[in-house]
Amino acid sequence: MARHETSFPEILDVAALRARCDFIASAHAEQREPMRRALLAAFKEANVAGRAKARELLAADGAGIKCAERISWLQDQLITLLHDFVLNQVFDAAKAPEASRIAVTAVGGYGRGTLAPGSDIDLLFLLPAKKAVWAEPAIEFMLYILWDLGFKVGHATRTIEECIRLSRADMTIRTAILECRYVCGSAALANELETRFDHEIVRNTGPEFIAAKLAERDERHRKAGDTRYLVEPNVKEGKGGLRDLHTLFWISKYFYRVKDSADLVKLGVLSKQEYKLFQKAEDFLWAVRCHMHFLTGKAEERLSFDIQREIAEALGYHDHPGLSAVERFMKHYFLVAKDVGDLTRIFCSALEDQQAKDTPGITGVISRFRNRVRKIAGTLDFVDDGGRIALAGTDVFKRDPVNLMRLFHIADINGLEFHPAALKQVTRSLGLITPHLRENEEANRLFLSILTSRRNPELILRRMNEAGVLGRFIPEFGKIVSMMQFNMYHHYTVDEHLLRSVDVLSRIERGLEEEAHPLTAMLMPGIEDREALYVAVLLHDIAKGRPEDHSVAGAKVARKLCPRFRLTPKQTEMVVWLVEEHLTMSMVAQTRDLNDRKTIVDFAERVQSLERLKMLLILTVCDIRAVGPGVWNGWKGQLLRTLYYETELLLSGGFSELSRKERAKHAAHMLEEALADWPKKERQAYVRLHYQPYLLTVALEEQVRHAGFIREADRAGRTLATMVRTHDFHAITEITVLSPDHPRLLTVIAGACAAAGANIVGAQIHTTSDGRALDTILVNREFSVAEDETRRAASIGKLIEDVLSGRKRLPEVIASRTRVKKRSRAFTVTPEVTISNTLSNKFTVIEVEGLDRTGLLSEVTAVLSDLSLDIASAHITTFGEKVIDTFYVTDLVGSKITSENRQMNIAARLKAVLAGEVDEARERMPSGIIAPTPVSRVPHGSKTTKAET
């Protein structure tokens, strides 16, 4: 067990601090408490100065490992000086016999000789078999000093015998002792532990340790999110992070008995180039981690949005066209994480080969060693090695580079996993993927077969991407490998998103998504050209990170690649169109009024055919589903289905005002029949309350619930009432509000929801013929248990009633809730306002875009009301930190807003609100609107609002 081989005198003048300790001892020889305070002050000063110097040097040289070593060395010196002071000055044990002395050793990450600024200090105090009476009090004194210095100290006090016994049964303790490093005290005691541990624990238990460490790694990945491409990665514990490199080192030290990772080159486990990759990856990850700890002042391991921009700046990244500095930094991070995955695969391959030679027949998590090798029908280049495809020879790829594609194709059609040695050879053969191979007809045929496989194409494509083949074979794809988008909407890197999109498509086709996506599941078997659809799904975001709009640029990439994949001109045109329009259906569904005929007509003109409509719907579903957890919900699906059905009617010639009136008449009849237990006159009068949009867009089951709700409120004489219901599948909660209509009603309801901490994800807002509003507000679900969520919804409903009735004043309740979300501070969204009179025949359409915040919808609608605008429908769409709100409005007499001066005033007022400036409209929010005279509405008869998160 060796101390640090390198000294860092620039971090700490050890001699000067030792002299100061001696002075403190002599000055306070008989006064323990003053001595303790003086010692604490001296150590605190030295620690602060040393760490500040380490931070300064990190900023200057960018050397991550060196920074971690400097801090570890500093810690060693402080502990050594503390140990010597305590034994010599406090307990007078300096002359104690060697046999009674203790040893202080570092374990865990500190034991490796590296320490992050905010990390725990893990210590193992070794006691001799016959401990001295002063041993434990001395250890306790040291620990209290370290704690008072602000260190988080993990510690254990054991004899060597206890260490050996516990490490046999506990793999965590075994790993800690494996990394044990002598710091101070009895070197003989530390060396004895090392020798006994090596002989009694490590010897002949390699496979057991390897299996446990790899199983532990898999479980860690599962908990952290089993992808290295989460856009807020855990630098320490995440996939492709430092812990993965540490696991390789633990196994190396345990199995190969190496002291340094450089020894792996001598053993032939890693090539010189791979070892350099190991060093670069480790140094980069350490630099990131140290900067994170210094910046946050704590052991922050998640590279969150809040700090990514500052870390990028600290590491010297700059903006480039199409990619910001933070996006360039994060792309580098994910490429390094991918390198760690490559190294893990190469290492496990070498490990398996070594174990197969040494101990044939061992089985475990790492592999099935040397199962019987079998031939694979139709090929002489590959074999089946225990259910994994392996190479039949060392020159398989060099002899025929197309075999780089055949490997993955044969694995797919035979349902085989991949032997790590085969993937290692793939990584080492990437130079064979040349322009000639990219144009090879057979190679492209094999790739298209893999992409459109009816088995599990995402799995094979993922292996190709991890091995580096996908980015080499399709250079345009290589450009977006590991690329992140600096926003809260996208959860994964671009390449990860595309692979997940293909997986969603495959699952839909295999019938695994019928419950979640009934319409797409029904349409998929009838798709005429599944090849074009799969290619479009893979390519839809391939041009991200370019200065040009990625949909337009992506269409150009698709036009270039499709002929290479041997798609026909007709297929190519379909793919090009799908890529260029891949955002259209989502944006129309979420930001436009689907009850406005011009919305459907304009969308149908862009789509032009039923086949395009079907394929665009499926692509849209795949795209949204693959963005990340919680982005898709049933409400979003309902919007897309509505847009699909309305457009399908128009494209098939069935859409007309007459058919719409007939459908509304039929819906009214169905509602009347559903209320058959009501007196005839009462049910007829009730049905006459509702306009066409309500009858056509609200499900009959909901209409019946509303009928009971309104009837009960009327009988109780309540002009204001609320009703709540939770939806497990949609992951939303409904709050239905019955109230007298009012121009500011949406403002007040949205404000009350914001004040209650509820995030609006959708709304269905309708006006009845007797001047009342029937609004169903949809909010994100917070609790998994229905009873808890119902209670929460009821409290929100109560707050809405209190605000509407004037019992509580809206500005005050909003003010208490409008603290800016911490995560949102990391982002900037330029406020934009667009006013159009061409998107609707009846209404002026106002679209606002800005940084989301609590109460924003309430503020925006307050401004619109203050400007004497009547909101016919509103569509609130949130993409992470960015909100896009669209309002269909008229003036108070039902006309469009055509005056340029008035449009400019509207835009200016809205931009001010989006920018967070105080607007007088907010101060004029009504205290309550329960008793106003009903306002006459524009003749469309019903307001509708959509919102999404």
From Swiss-Prot:
Keywords: Hydrolase, Magnesium, Multifunctional enzyme, Nitrogen fixation, Nucleotidyltransferase, Repeat, Transferase. InterPro entries: ACT-like_dom_sf (IPR045865), ACT_dom (IPR002912), HD/PDEase_dom (IPR003607), HD_domain (IPR006674), NT_sf (IPR043519), PII_UdlTrfase/GS_AdlTrfase (IPR013546), Polymerase_NTP_transf_dom (IPR002934), UTase/UR (IPR010043). PROSITE patterns: ACT (PS51671), HD (PS51831). The keyword Hydrolase applies. Residues 1-377 are annotated as: Uridylyltransferase. Its cofactor is Mg(2+). Residues 926-949 are annotated as: Disordered. Uridylyltransferase (UTase) activity is inhibited by glutamine, while glutamine activates uridylyl-removing (UR) activity. Its EC number is 2.7.7.59, 3.1.4.-. Residues 734-816, 845-926 form the ACT domain. PANTHER family: BIFUNCTIONAL URIDYLYLTRANSFERASE/URIDYLYL-REMOVING ENZYME, BIFUNCTIONAL URIDYLYLTRANSFERASE_URIDYLYL-REMOVING ENZYME. This is Bifunctional uridylyltransferase/uridylyl-removing enzyme.
